[in-house]
């Protein structure tokens, strides 16, 4: 994975961390256009992570642990039954953050790649 610039990573993490409040605003009918877009981006990015885990049940459990680790700022060591090693866990987390940043058009375009990759 390509390392994200600190500012891009911080903004993408903030988008993920705000997702629980965003869900409440959507549920209460008080959501902005950004709320709707960001909630969809976070959901799609999360579902796209951990693609190398074959079991759908295990993949969803891992995705939930990654999501909670970012939303509640919990390190790997505080997550019970992480289902993988520390390094793999943080690679999945980085993948999730990068997918959010990419979907929000926060990443610089790479030479030789089309927009949106």
Predicted segments — roles?
Residues 54-74:
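Short amphipathic alpha helix immediately N-terminal
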